[in-house]
């Protein structure tokens, strides 16, 4: 009975330890930053044109300060392939010829004293893994911080509700202001310390998850 209780406890612990934290919309970590603009004092000059509200037709529209919006073009592609194998062979062979004494075989209970023993073992294991992923699209993010060297910390998320579930994209990383294109976009491959997450919640996402019993058989707790 104790063995069954221990096995049940191990199954429960495995299931609990492998349950990831569910993502939520409006996560404070991805909340946008709203810069505080100082109040603008407009002098009453009687003219329609105001210097404080003027903008150049040739000014740079690229994001460069906290709160600005930048569009990140997702161009991610990864491919990994790995194969491994090992083979172990072991064998032993031992022979003991009959023992003679006084011109006759020594015996025990009428059975001659001789020995022949042979043993062999052959273990072979092979494993192959081939995985490829790609992600294309775009997402707009906010500049959260401007570092001392001019690099920009960007972060943002996008949630899309479809039927009975939600799909989301989250992006965070560090970009150089020099890598931002004139149309205020930057490729995701130009981001440092990039964290790109594309997943979903709801019925469709839950259907793709592995059950807790299957997780146990595929975990390190399974002894075979």
From Swiss-Prot:
Alphabetic keyword roster: Bacterial flagellum, Cell outer membrane, Lipoprotein, Membrane, Palmitate, Signal
Role: Assembles around the rod to form the L-ring and probably protects the motor/basal body from shearing forces during rotation.
Family annotation (PROSITE patterns): PROKAR_LIPOPROTEIN (PS51257)
Superkingdom classification of source: Bacteria
Main location: membrane
Species annotation: Shewanella oneidensis (strain ATCC 700550 / JCM 31522 / CIP 106686 / LMG 19005 / NCIMB 14063 / MR-1)
Protein name per Swiss-Prot or TrEMBL: Flagellar L-ring protein
Gene: flgH
Subunit structure: The basal body constitutes a major portion of the flagellar organelle and consists of four rings (L,P,S, and M) mounted on a central rod.
């Amino acid at each position: 009975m104790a063995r069954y209780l221990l096995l049940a406890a191990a199954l429960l612990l495995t299931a609990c330890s492998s349950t990831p934290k569910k993502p939520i919309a409006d996560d404070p970590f991805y909340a946008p930053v709203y810069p505080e603009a100082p109040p603008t004092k407009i002098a009453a000059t009687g003219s329609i044109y105001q210097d404080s509200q003027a903008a150049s037709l040739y000014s740079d529209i690229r994001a460069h300060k906290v709160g600005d919006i930048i569009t990140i073009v997702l161009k991610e592609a990864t491919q990994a392939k790995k194969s491994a194998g090992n083979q172990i062979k072991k064998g032993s062979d031992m022979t003991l010829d009959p023992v003679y004494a006084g011109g006759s075989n020594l015996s025990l209970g009428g059975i001659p004293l001789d020995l022949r023993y042979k043993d062999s073992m052959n273990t072979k294991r092979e494993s192959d893994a081939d995985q490829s992923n790609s992600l294309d699209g775009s997402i707009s993010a906010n500049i959260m911080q401007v570092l001392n060297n001019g690099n920009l910390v960007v972060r943002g998320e996008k949630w899309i509700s479809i039927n009975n579930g939600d799909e989301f994209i989250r992006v965070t990383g560090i970009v150089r202001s020099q890598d931002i294109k004139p149309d205020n976009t930057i490729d995701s491959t130009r981001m440092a310390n990039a964290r790109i997450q594309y997943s979903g919640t709801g019925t469709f996402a839950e259907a793709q998850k592995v059950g807790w019993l299957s997780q146990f058989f595929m975990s390190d707790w399974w002894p075979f």
